[in-house]
A protein has these predicted regions:
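Short alpha-helix within the catalytic core of nucleotide-sugar-dependent glycosyltransferases
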Residues: 32-33, 37, 57-68, 110, ...
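Active-site-proximal specificity loops/subdomain of glycosyltransferases
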Residues: 4-43
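Conserved nucleotide-sugar donor-binding catalytic segment
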Residues: 104, 114-119
Length: 225
């Protein structure tokens, strides 16, 4: 997708595909922290783009404030498309979320201690990040990006025997973790990039182009934590 014509190869940017290479449940917050720490020395801001949101029209320009980049793309998504189910999760109000594709200045990311490492399986690392911004009284900007959601089975919701949409165990467990984490507004200071340990298993160059002082690079990085 990105090797075709979707990006200007003369921009000064680094595009990293982070892969969690272990048998543990998925932990998006830790993956995001790994991406930041690997590239911290030379970045001035980062964009966290979930792999299941494909940018069609997106504004990735620098902002001094954290920014939610998606406006169109939080469609009513099917719960279990692999079973041809028509039951859906309703689109969230974007004033209540900070997910999908978000921009975070380096100084803001460090101030809020990055993402929590406590959420395994599905969800709430984004809700936790929004709370970190809110308790630090950091305003969130909103841009008008258009993204194509890539449809897949939802790990946060399932369909019970009565054909109703209910939260999965991952959802329930992470909701409990979120409530425990935020029984004190200072707990986030102990859970984030300052407490995260990981190892880089591989760091593969996919594409590289140098022109004048601009380096455009695509890398696939596997990490374990």
């Amino acid at each position: 997708y990105f090797n075709e014509d979707k990006l200007d190869k003369y921009l000064n940017l680094k595009l990293c595909f982070l892969e969690q290479a272990n048998d543990k449940p998925f932990n998006l917050g830790s993956l995001n922290n790994a991406g930041f720490l690997i590239n911290e020395d030379y970045l001035d801001y980062l964009v966290v783009n979930n792999i299941d949101f494909l940018p069609m029209i997106a504004d990735y320009r620098y902002s001094e404030s954290p920014s939610l980049l998606i406006k169109h793309g939080y469609n009513n998504l099917p719960i279990v498309p692999s079973k041809n189910s028509r039951l859906i999760v309703k689109s969230p109000r974007r004033e209540n979320v900070f997910l999908g594709s978000v921009l975070l200045p380096k100084n803001v990311f460090k101030k809020v201690n990055g993402y929590s490492n406590s959420y395994w399986g599905w969800g709430f690392e984004d809700t936790d990040m929004r709370r970190r911004l809110e308790v630090n009284k950091i305003n969130i900007n909103y841009r008008d990006g258009f993204y194509q959601p890539l449809i897949h089975d939802n790990l946060g919701y399932e369909i019970n025997d009565e054909k109703k949409v209910v939260p999965t165990k991952y959802h329930i467990d992470n909701q409990k973790t979120f409530n425990e984490n935020w029984n004190n507004d200072e707990n986030y200071l102990k859970d984030g990039i300052n407490s995260f340990k990981f190892e880089i298993l591989s760091n593969q160059e996919i594409y590289k182009n140098m022109r004048n002082d601009a380096l455009f690079e695509i890398r696939h990085i596997k990490v374990n934590f």
